[in-house]
Regions:
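Surface-exposed amphipathic alpha-helical tracts and adjacent flexible/coil segments at the periphery
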Residues: 1-197
Length: 197
């Protein structure tokens, strides 16, 4: 059977074969103890010492999301779909697996040549959406794109949440945002400017 990762965090090295963590901290990524040095900010200099990028997360990749390629992967002979979930919370696993289950069920219903490998049907009492779970932005990870800039997340290694709008005005006591998302007391908000967060 052909297995393919379809969703989750990406390693700037070959996952499970990065030695940066072990060299700098003694924690082996090969044993599930990655210190995630790729998620730290770095400053990039050219050969003359001129700063090209300052305090950017230059090695931090977006998360893989191959929702749009799911049917093409099945057509290519993939029979095992993998979701990266190491150290993820239960809500993440529930949401993301439900998302892909719904997508697969829709394909199976439309394409009778595909046969389920198991019996039964799963019902969900929520609307799964990977944008609602922790993510660093999504990329199909060079599956369909040749633009390598679409795979990195240099401004932050954190989950940015949903886009809520554009800051229109800032005063000493308030911030005015033009957007369509409803906000509630206690919601966390990230601000991005021209140089990142």
């Amino acid at each position: 059977p052909l297995e393919v990762f379809i969703h989750g965090a990406l390693c700037v090295s070959y996952s499970g074969q990065c030695y940066l963590s072990h060299c700098l901290s003694g924690r082996s990524a090969n044993r599930g103890e990655c210190a995630q040095y790729c998620r730290l900010p770095y400053t990039l200099l050219d050969a003359d010492g001129k700063v090209l990028e300052k305090n950017k997360h230059l090695l931090s990749l977006k998360d893989m999301n191959r929702t749009d390629s799911l049917e093409a992967l099945l057509d290519a002979g993939v029979s095992s779909l993998k979701i990266e979930g190491r150290l993820k919370e239960m809500s993440y696993v529930k949401n993301v697996t439900a998302w892909y289950r719904k997508k697969l069920d829709a394909i199976l219903e439309r394409r009778p040549e595909y046969v389920r490998s198991s019996s039964g049907k799963t019902d969900f009492f929520f609307a799964p959406d990977p944008n609602k779970s922790f993510n660093r932005g999504f990329t199909p990870y060079l599956l369909n794109e040749k633009d390598s800039r679409s795979i990195s997340s240099p401004d932050t290694p954190k989950s940015m949440g949903e886009y809520i709008g554009t800051v229109k005005q800032v005063s000493s006591k308030s911030i005015t945002v033009a957007g369509v998302q409803k906000l509630n007391n206690g919601d966390g908000i990230c601000f991005f400017n021209e140089s990142g967060i």
